[in-house]
């Protein structure tokens, strides 16, 4: 299958969703050589991936993941693509605690640093959260705490087949955008930040195809894969299978514009300190951007009827102490798990 797919893509033709899924199945089962995988990924990058192709890949990757079960009817994920090169602190990770603090269950999917100095797993570890949990421990955490971190390398074992080819070709491929589309807990509400404005509507259409109930796919002013304060951000809303594209202007909600530079992060320790200060109530542009992004998560999760109400609830989550309390609860719960509940690295 993969040989035919390579020939088709090299000739400039697109794969159907079914063809892409069949190729992904072959890759995820170890049936493709590293050279074939590298050739396909490079050819797809040069041609440009389509909604059909990304959907086919994501659907199979979801099926091959280690599935995490939850008692919650609604789960929010705030995982973005990364790759914006802006070097900001971990905005979506801080926003996840604000959403969870407001009572909306969060299944935060993420990894260690790939395209930045600090990934979500890195900053969570600095905050004291244990991330190396097996499926049963993640499920218990999600059901008891109402928030859990889903560490991608432990829940997407089949991705090991593509790690070598991706590393060796050293270019951005479709796999750079599959992570946020393949939450192992099947999160049905999302805030997904993308590094390119071109990807916003495309990935929104993919989420709609995959059956996500409510989502916002965003590309921030200044090139961020988050809603930013630098100006109006692209906002694509997924709702009931349809996609609506628009802009979110922070000034409309009373926020002052601020350059991306004021959101600068650093090492995992520095980013953890920034996140903790925000959750403890420090005011300023960094809090504002977290509240904005959390508001979208609250709307997607059904807690807020609109962005304005989401902003009020997000601010209350911080000011009431509930957001930082959720962090402390997660730290305590994961720290008390027995060694047997940690996955082998």
Swiss-Prot record:
Residues that coordinate or bind anthranilate 2: 166
EC number(s) stated in the UniProt entry for this protein: 2.4.2.18
Gene Ontology MF terms: anthranilate phosphoribosyltransferase activity; magnesium ion binding
Pfam families: Glycos_trans_3N (PF02885), Glycos_transf_3 (PF00591)
Required cofactor names: Mg(2+)
Residues making up the signal peptide according to the UniProt record: none
Record keywords, A-Z: Amino-acid biosynthesis, Aromatic amino acid biosynthesis, Glycosyltransferase, Magnesium, Metal-binding, Transferase, Tryptophan biosynthesis
Positions that bind 5-phospho-alpha-D-ribose 1-diphosphate: 80, 83-84, 88, 90-93, 108-116, 120
GO cellular component: cytosol
Pathway: Amino-acid biosynthesis; L-tryptophan biosynthesis; L-tryptophan from chorismate: step 2/5
Entry's cofactor comment: Binds 2 magnesium ions per monomer.
SUPFAM superfamilies xrefs: Nucleoside phosphorylase/phosphoribosyltransferase catalytic domain, Nucleoside phosphorylase/phosphoribosyltransferase N-terminal domain
Binding site for Mg(2+) 2: 225-226
GO biological processes: L-tryptophan biosynthetic process
Catalytically driven reaction(s): N-(5-phospho-beta-D-ribosyl)anthranilate + diphosphate = 5-phospho-alpha-D-ribose 1-diphosphate + anthranilate
Residues annotated for Mg(2+) 1 binding in this entry: 92, 226
InterPro entries (UniProt xref): Anthranilate_Pribosyl_Tfrase (IPR005940), Glycosyl_Trfase_fam3 (IPR000312), Glycosyl_Trfase_fam3_N_dom (IPR017459), Glycosyl_Trfase_fam3_N_dom_sf (IPR036320), Nuc_phospho_transferase (IPR035902)
Binding site for anthranilate 1: 80, 111
PANTHER family found in the cross-reference section: ANTHRANILATE PHOSPHORIBOSYLTRANSFERASE (PTHR43285:SF2)
Family classification: Belongs to the anthranilate phosphoribosyltransferase family.
Quaternary structure, from the entry: Homodimer.
Main function: Catalyzes the transfer of the phosphoribosyl group of 5-phosphorylribose-1-pyrophosphate (PRPP) to anthranilate to yield N-(5'-phosphoribosyl)-anthranilate (PRA).
Name this protein carries in UniProt: Anthranilate phosphoribosyltransferase
Organism: Pelotomaculum thermopropionicum (strain DSM 13744 / JCM 10971 / SI)
This protein's encoding gene: trpD
